[in-house]
């Protein structure tokens, strides 16, 4: 499923530049020919055998030969039928390819969109082309979604074709050898290893049932010795799911990857994914508890479970790690499979994604949007909670800058859909991954955002989220399904190294922070609609008189804060409120 993170330039080019229908139709024709030859061979073999036994060859030897030959005639007929089925499946694959080709956007249309975007960006000196750039990006996202939907459809159709192909029948001689081996070891059934087993796939001795591991177990999936029941682990247990020894009843093995919140739902499951390089050794309770702080305000009761994703980004997570694109693609596969499994079980699903897994959630939203309405989950069945989202429409670093690094396997992924499913998107102020400045020429804002990535996003400074102080940010329409919340940062990440200096570090940082915050905030537009993708601009519209007044107020506040930090009374009472 790598195509889920590949841009339309790649997906469209691949489907249009491929070999086409020819090889698949040729394969279908070849399988048809093989089926005809096998049918003819079976008929000829049966005819010769019948002729011999019906004319000159009679007696016990003739009867024995007839009995020996009959299974081979059946094998030839079965193989002929399987070859004919393979021919039909090849034609189905060709039809699926033809439908995919028709549904995929042509490379010429993709190139036209990219050319138009490049022209708009080049001429966007004063930001006047921002609406047109956003429209071009929106069109590009639609093209991306259409290509991904076509490729997912092709993947599903091709997978269905492949799974319907039956393996070639095992030879009669091998079947006979398997039966003789089972009888010689005193086993009755198939796949047993040991002596005296009755059933299938038992490993040990004197087991009765299926999939037991040990000795003298009766039941299904028991591990240990002399258990009676299903799924017991230990010895001498009678019941279901017991862990221990000599117990009777029902048990539930402890699951270190599950956290029950509130009343546990019921029927509400939270799938919790970590960020880049967060594939921690189990258990993952700290991650589940962290996610619970953000999920619980909307869902007071649910059962949270850790969903494993690769969480890798070559070369930052190691020279042997997966590239970002491959890691995200595998994560999308894991997430989609888990969502469908929970929905099939009748559960409502909440997806929690942070950092890289927020990008995984973005791709899953897009894929679900591309499906017909009757095939995708309802708005009351699925919701998302995101933090540290690099695809946030206004502020996400992957949305601010439309760049890809093919050498590192890193492809632009665009903005998270705002109208796919009910979503709460939390952004930490000054974390450059989800709150990157709109005007990066502001060196104070950009340096502070980079420091935010280093100190806040990486977790080097563990700050508990203060959800009560979160600011709900504006959106373009009340019908938008996503709620955007900004969690304020009391201190600027850029001043973290200064605060590390003993004794004088904090007072000096407190002295300059209010004025520095004024300069940093000039790099942001806090009034922008958060659901509208916002690429970077060059120069903000600034009221310099207001900036001068804010700097004057900040200077007073800085002196008050510095003296307060030293335990001295401030010269101006009362202290002015902090700037946001």
Curated annotation (Swiss-Prot):
Domain of life, source organism: Bacteria
Pfam families named in the record:
PE-PPE (PF08237), PPE (PF00823)
Q: Where is the PE-PPE domain?
A: 300-525
Q: Which GO terms describe its biological process?
A: response to host immune response
Gene3D superfamilies per UniProt: alpha/beta hydrolase, PPE superfamily
Q: Which family does it belong to?
A: Belongs to the mycobacterial PPE family.
The protein's name is Uncharacterized PPE family protein PPE42
Organism, scientific name:
Mycobacterium tuberculosis (strain CDC 1551 / Oshkosh)
Gene name on record?
A: PPE42
């Amino acid at each position: 499923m790598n195509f889920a993170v590949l841009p339309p330039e790649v997906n469209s080019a691949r489907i249009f530049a491929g070999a086409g229908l020819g090889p698949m139709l040729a394969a279908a024709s070849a399988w048809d020919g093989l089926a005809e030859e096998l049918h003819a061979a079976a008929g000829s073999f049966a005819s010769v055998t019948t002729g011999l036994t019906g004319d000159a060859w009679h007696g016990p030897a003739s009867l024995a030969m007839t009995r020996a030959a009959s299974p081979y005639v059946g094998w030839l007929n079965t193989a002929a039928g399987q070859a004919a089925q393979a021919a039909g499946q090849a034609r189905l694959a060709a039809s699926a390819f033809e439908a995919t080709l028709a549904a995929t956007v042509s490379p010429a249309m993709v190139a036209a969109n990219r050319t138009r975007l490049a022209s708009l960006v080049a001429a966007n000196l004063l930001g006047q082309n921002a609406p047109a750039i956003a429209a071009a990006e929106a069109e590009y996202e639609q093209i991306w979604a259409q290509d991904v939907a076509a490729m997912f459809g092709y993947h599903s159709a091709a997978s269905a074709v492949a799974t319907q192909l039956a393996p070639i029948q095992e030879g009669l001689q091998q079947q006979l050898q398997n039966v003789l081996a089972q009888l010689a070891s005193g086993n009755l059934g198939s796949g047993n290893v040991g002596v005296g087993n009755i059933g299938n796939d038992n490993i040990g001795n004197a087991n009765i049932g299926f999939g037991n591991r040990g000795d003298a177990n009766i039941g299904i999936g028991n591990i240990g010795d002399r258990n009676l029941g299903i799924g017991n682990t230990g010895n001498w247990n009678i019941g279901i799911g017991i862990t221990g020894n000599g117990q009777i009843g029902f048990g539930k093995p402890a699951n270190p990857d599950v956290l029950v919140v509130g009343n546990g739902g019921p029927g509400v499951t939270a799938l919790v994914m970590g960020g880049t390089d967060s594939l921690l050794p189990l258990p993952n309770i700290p991650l589940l508890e962290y996610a619970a702080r953000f999920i619980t305000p909307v869902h007071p009761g649910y059962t949270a479970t850790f969903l494993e994703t690769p969480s890798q980004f070559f070369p930052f997570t190691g020279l042997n790690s997966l590239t970002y694109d491959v890691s995200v693609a595998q994560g999308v596969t894991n997430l989609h499979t888990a969502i469908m499994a929970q929905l099939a079980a009748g559960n409502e699903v909440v997806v929690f994604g942070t950092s890289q897994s927020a990008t995984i959630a973005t791709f899953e939203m897009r894929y679900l949007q591309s499906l017909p309405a009757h095939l995708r989950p309802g708005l009351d069945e699925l919701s998302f909670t995101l933090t540290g989202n690099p695809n946030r429409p206004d502020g996400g670093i992957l949305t601010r800058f439309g760049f890809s690094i093919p050498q590192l396997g890193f492809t632009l992924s665009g903005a998270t859909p705002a109208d796919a499913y009910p979503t709460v998107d939390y952004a930490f102020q000054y974390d450059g991954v989800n709150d990157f400045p709109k005007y990066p020429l502001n060196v104070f804002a950009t340096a502070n955002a980079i420091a935010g990535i280093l100190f806040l996003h990486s977790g080097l400074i563990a700050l508990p989220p203060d959800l009560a102080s979160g600011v709900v940010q504006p959106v373009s329409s009340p019908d938008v399904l996503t709620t955007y919340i900004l969690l304020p940062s009391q201190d600027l990440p850029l001043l973290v190294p200064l605060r590390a200096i003993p004794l004088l570090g904090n007072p000096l940082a407190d002295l300059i922070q209010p004025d520095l915050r004024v300069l940093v905030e000039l790099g942001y537009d806090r009034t922008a609609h958060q659901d509208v993708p916002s690429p970077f601009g060059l120069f903000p519209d600034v009221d310099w008189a207001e900036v001068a007044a804010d700097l004057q107020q900040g200077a007073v506040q800085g002196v008050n804060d510095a003296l307060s930090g030293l335990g001295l009374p401030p010269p101006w009472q009362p202290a002015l409120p902090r700037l946001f």
